[in-house]
Amino acid sequence: SGEWSEEGDRLFKNTDTNGRFHSDWCSMIYSRLLLARNLLTDDGVIFISIDDNEQENLKKCCDEVFGARNFIAQIAWEKVHTRKNSAINFSSSHEYILCYAKVRRNYSGDTAGFKRNLLPRDNTDAYSNPDNDPKGPWKTDPITAHNYYAADYTITKPNGVVIKRPQDRYWAYSEDTMKRMIAENAIVWGEGNSMPLAKRYLCDVQDGLVPVTLFSREFAGDSSQAKKQIDSLFEECKGVFDYTKPVKLITRLLQIGSNPEDIVLDFFSGSATTAHAVMQLNAEDGGRRKFIMVQLPEKCDEASEAYKAGYKNICEIGKERIRRAGEK
């Protein structure tokens, strides 16, 4: 760009009109990925947000730096939920989050490398204990399935009605397992000739939920929620920062990838959403996570609300957000 920093370093702006745009972007991100890998502990993990423009290039860079064997997941995050009718082709509604481990665990018995956490279970209201079952709260599941699981047999209900499997379904349990469940009072018989149901006990399910690769706005927030969050912190200058991530999204990633004593590094920290999420999650689960935020002091546009409010560069916005979020 022809500009120079106060230290005498040449500043370069990579625009899409530059003939080497993608190559320059890859060079920029590659060096940062190498540094990130060196900073990760053996059980560490990295999450990288990216859109369609560089997703393919980022995946190749990550495969080379971390090794394709250490790829964990590519998450699709619902960034916006409204349709953009002015779009020429498709209205884009999502971004990606690539996840790589320093060392990936391939089997449940592995003890070295990254171990993802289960997400908190928030649907326990579906479980109850109307019959005072000694195993505790339960909910019902079908005893039949679409796919073949067990050989054919009949079930005799306490009222004498004989139940056969439906023609288009199969038993979900073997006959021996069904007999054991009946003996353990783990079957809900129902009235008349209705199909019995199996009890699924809350004590038998996992302590949490396995994360999936689709993050809906209800699960992880979206860009409109992110804007409302930062505007609520900077009420005197709404619109202080564009393109920020929702705290809920980063919190979900922290729940999956971090432990209570971990150090979280964000080297594109922007408005410091990651720091905000770390503090919020610590308050929720009693953790003592620490954060390191890295951001170049990019100047704010003089016409922007941030500049008018006295913030000369992005770092000043991030530091003030950390202070204000910490007070809440």
List PLM regions with ranges.
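Class I S-adenosyl-L-methionine
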Residues: 1-263, 285-288, 296-304
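A phosphate-binding catalytic loop at a beta-strand-loop-alpha-helix junction
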Residues: 262-281
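PRPP-dependent phosphoribosyltransferase catalytic core
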Residues: 280-328
